[in-house]
Amino acid sequence: MENKYVDLQENICSTFLQLFNTKMHWFKEMHPNDEKSIIDYTCTDRKDRKCHVELKQRLAKIDDYDTILLDATKLWAWTKIGYSDTLNDEQRLYFNFMNDGVIIYDINNQSEFKFYPRKKIWNPAEGKYEYRDKIGLPTKNAIIYRYNKDGTMTRVKNERYNKTYRD
C-alpha cells in the first residue's frame, strides 16, 4: 500500500545520504533496498565492506538528544542479517539527519542498548499514536558531524563522543 508520507521521508533521507556521501566520501556504492526491506540501503564503504544502512530524519538539533531511539524491529533485522550472512566484516549503520548535522551509530560497536518496551509514539504516516518497542542508543557512543555555515561538515571531536566506526 502506498503511503505518501513514508515515500516523502524515504526520498528526503535518500537525498540527505547522497549529500552526506558527496561531502564525506564514506561509500563507493549506495543502493536503496526494495520497499519491503526493513533496512533502507545496502552500501559498499571505502574499505570494500558491505554496509546495511538505516536512515532517519529528525527535526531537532544534535544537542537536543542524549539518547536516540531506534525501532526494535530495525535492530532485530540487523541481527537477522548478521546471522544469515557468511561475511563477518559487514557494517550496520544508523544515520540520523538532524537540523544541524548528522548522528551516526555503528551498531557493530555499540555496547550500550537500553530497552524501552511499549513506548508511546506519534506515527505521522498513520496519523495516530502507537505503542512500539524502542532501543535507546546514547549519543556519547555516536559519530557526530555538524554542518558549517559554508556548507561543509566537521566531525565533532570532544570527550562526549567516543571513538567508533571511522576513527
Regions found by a protein language model. Name each.
Residues N21, P32-N33, R46, G82-Q91:
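Intrinsically disordered, low-complexity coil segments
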Residues R58-I81:
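Mg2+/Mn2+-dependent nuclease catalytic core
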Residues Y41-C43, K47-K61:
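Conserved catalytic cores of phosphodiester-cleaving nucleases, focusing on short active-site segments
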